[in-house]
């Protein structure tokens, strides 16, 4: 699963998820899956969506993952009283803003790519839309 190799600090504050995304265009592939809402995508969810897409296209073409889980989420163990410091890092998340491109695909038929993105969007906790590359 995806997570940073090393970070400056082990734990991070929760923060807020406001504003719009900057990476909102199809940059690498021909067709992309774009987030409509905002959420926190865990590394497990990203991997699950990637596997669903890869299996559907039968390892043809190329898939780009445009998000990376770089924010640690901590959790205290069960049945532990409050206080005594912050819990240990449980998993990693990527903060998703509206308009952010999640996945891109190239080298497969458009109908197959749309079906693969539909499978992947079922694994994600955010509404998505499919965007095609516009040639200038």
UniProtKB/Swiss-Prot annotation:
Could you identify this protein by its name?
A: Large ribosomal subunit protein uL16
**Quaternary structure, from the entry:** Part of the 50S ribosomal subunit.
Query: What cellular-component terms does GO give this entry?
Result: cytosolic large ribosomal subunit
Has UniProt tagged this entry with the keyword Phosphoprotein?
A: no
Respond yes or no to whether keyword RNA-binding is given for this record.
yes
What the record says about family reads: Belongs to the universal ribosomal protein uL16 family.
Q: Which cysteines are joined by disulfide bonds?
A: none
Q: What does the organism's lineage look like at the top?
A: Bacteria, Pseudomonadati, Pseudomonadota, Gammaproteobacteria, Candidatus Pseudothioglobaceae
Known function: Binds 23S rRNA and is also seen to make contacts with the A and possibly P site tRNAs.
The GO terms this record gives for MF are: rRNA binding; structural constituent of ribosome; tRNA binding
Q: Which domain of life is it from?
A: Bacteria
- Can you name the source organism? Vesicomyosocius okutanii subsp. Calyptogena okutanii (strain HA)
GO biological process, alphabetically ordered: translation
Key words, A-Z = Ribonucleoprotein, Ribosomal protein, RNA-binding, rRNA-binding, tRNA-binding
Q: Which PANTHER family match?
A: 50S/60S RIBOSOMAL PROTEIN L16, LARGE RIBOSOMAL SUBUNIT PROTEIN UL16M
Q: Which CDD domains match?
A: Ribosomal_L16_L10e
